[in-house]
Amino acid sequence: MKLVLKISGKFFDEENIENFISLRNTIKNIVNEGHRLAIVSGGGSTARKYIKIGRELGVNEAHLDLLGIWASRLNAYLLTFILSDLSYMKVPENLEEFIEKWESEKVVITGGFQPGQSTATVAALVSEAIAADYLILATNVDGVYDKDPRYNKDAKLLSKLNTETLKKILETSQSVKAGTYELLDPLAIKIIERSKIKVIVMNYKRLNKILDIIHGKDIGSIIEPM
């Protein structure tokens, strides 16, 4: 099975060593079972910090995007070094380079590719390029909710939904400014739909459950492409 794991930048913000150990052990188990894996990392608070400073000083959005991309690559290199016995040691900087490195049979870890593109879009592009069986979005919530759980205590977790439902949920909460992407942006959804990529949203504190997903168990929210 081929998997793409998109790890939210919030994973890195927590600086929780146990989370990193769990991730490393999980990836080793996935590889030992004979599965292929690519990882895409978000930029997290490191990206937001530099983007905030740059924006206040008048830096344009394209250059702010570059700051976010470099922050996401820094996080990607951290994972690359943690998984040095399994991973390709150079973080790809574009899709062509990723495809080339994928042929190495190693775990390929990347961050952002280009301005105007979220790391969620990168994850969707990578999933499309390798014909992934699943794109797994590991974030700080248990799945997709019918409304933003940060601000609505009555928000309900949706175990299954399609991309049309997801678009309606995200309509009022998304921004296209650098450093503000959440979950999936419109371009990522478009790629998911055109290539019929199955997406799973789960909490990164449950990364040890990825093998359960591979073995057919429902974890988090499953998003079916329309």
UniProtKB/Swiss-Prot annotation:
Q: Which reaction does it catalyse?
A: UMP + ATP = UDP + ADP
Kindly list the positions annotated as binding ATP: K6, I7, S8, G9, K10, G44, R48, T139, N140, Y145, D148
Looking at the record's lineage, which domain of life comes first?
A: Archaea
InterPro entries from the UniProt entry? AceGlu_kinase-like_sf, Asp/Glu/Uridylate_kinase, Uridylate_kinase, Uridylate_kinase_arch/spir
Instruction: Name the top EC class.
Output: transferase
Which Gene Ontology terms describe the biological processes this protein takes part in?
A: 'de novo' CTP biosynthetic process; UDP biosynthetic process
Specify one Pfam family.
AA_kinase
Name a GO molecular-function annotation: UMP kinase activity
User: Which positions does UniProt annotate for UMP binding?
Assistant: G43, D65, F113, Q114, P115, G116, Q117, S118, T119
UniProt signal peptide: none
Enzyme Commission code = 2.7.4.22
Entry keywords, A to Z? ATP-binding, Cytoplasm, Kinase, Nucleotide-binding, Pyrimidine biosynthesis, Transferase
Q: Where in the cell is it found?
A: Cytoplasm
Which GO cellular component term is one of those annotated? Answer: cytoplasm
Q: How does its activity get regulated?
A: Inhibited by UTP.
| Biological pathway | Pyrimidine metabolism; CTP biosynthesis via de novo pathway; UDP from UMP (UMPK route): step 1/1
Which PANTHER family does the UniProt entry name for this protein? URIDYLATE KINASE, URIDYLATE KINASE PUMPKIN, CHLOROPLASTIC
The record's function comment reads: Catalyzes the reversible phosphorylation of UMP to UDP.
Family of this protein: Belongs to the UMP kinase family.
Subunit structure of this chain's protein: Homohexamer.
UniProt protein name: Uridylate kinase
**Organism annotation:** Sulfurisphaera tokodaii (strain DSM 16993 / JCM 10545 / NBRC 100140 / 7)
Source species taxonomy:
Archaea, Thermoproteota, Thermoprotei, Sulfolobales, Sulfolobaceae
What's the name of its gene? pyrH
